[in-house]
Amino acid sequence: AETVEKLAPEMDNISAKLKQVDDAISQIDENRYPKTINGMNVRENITQAKATVSGLASSLSNFQPIVKLLPDLLGNPDPRKYLLLFQNDAELRATGGFLTAYATLTITKGKIEPGISEDIYTLDNGFKKKVPAPDPIKKYLPLVYNWNLRDMNLSPDFKVSMDTFTTYMRESSVAPEYDAIIAIDTEVPVRILKVLGPIGVSGYGGKFSAENDPRCDCPQVIYELENIITKPTYEIREGRKSILGPLMNSMLANMMGSPKAKWAEFFNIFTESIEQKHLLMYFKDENKQLAAEALGAAGRLTTYTEGD
């Protein structure tokens, strides 16, 4: 957190310099150069370089608001509590997947401390209020008469869904404390494990990896997650409750201990997951929420006027 704190004030300067480089390189007309010289793809390389620099300049500009908040987000000076939601994209919902499990973690001056890790039904079991199911639930789930927390991500606008979810979640007897919500789907652990390689998870035998599993012709971690999460509760109750937290913990620990050469890959995973809505953020604090929206990480729907 202290290192980030030193970096944050430099972001404006770094962004301005990168913008100057982008402006300069964008003036280069690649069509004035031959396609190849001695077997080297000159024109194609220039085009790719221009696109890369332009993308970096744009990304850094979008990241500035959130980077300036990073010390605070990493628990400096005060600890920050995060609620992780797992969206199972094999069962589609408006925000990206069925809300299957949740976990909590606390970050204090950059140090991550795991909290609880539970099945989403644990949260619902503590929610005793009878809220009539809205029309979409009644239409597609006719035997569900009440609106459960697990079904409250009805709006494709993530903030709207989380406003609803958190409003009612407060009434659950087991509602966790949080400063922010981070929702991920199966694509996030797959991408991270492609960089990390197979990792162990405390309390579970074997390894979790992104390698293809012939049982599903999909990444092994997806098979294991869905196998554990979708089994009937009476068969594997403890597994359902605990898989998300330990898996995320193990991945975070392995990422933090990775060589610096891999950090760029993790950064790319983070940015691509945000761009493709595999990772979504929701903050209680308005300034942090606005920063997440500027980054494109808040899953907001944008209304365009005619002519835009």
Identify the role of each PLM range.
Residues A1-D308:
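Non-catalytic, solvent-exposed segments at the cell envelope interface
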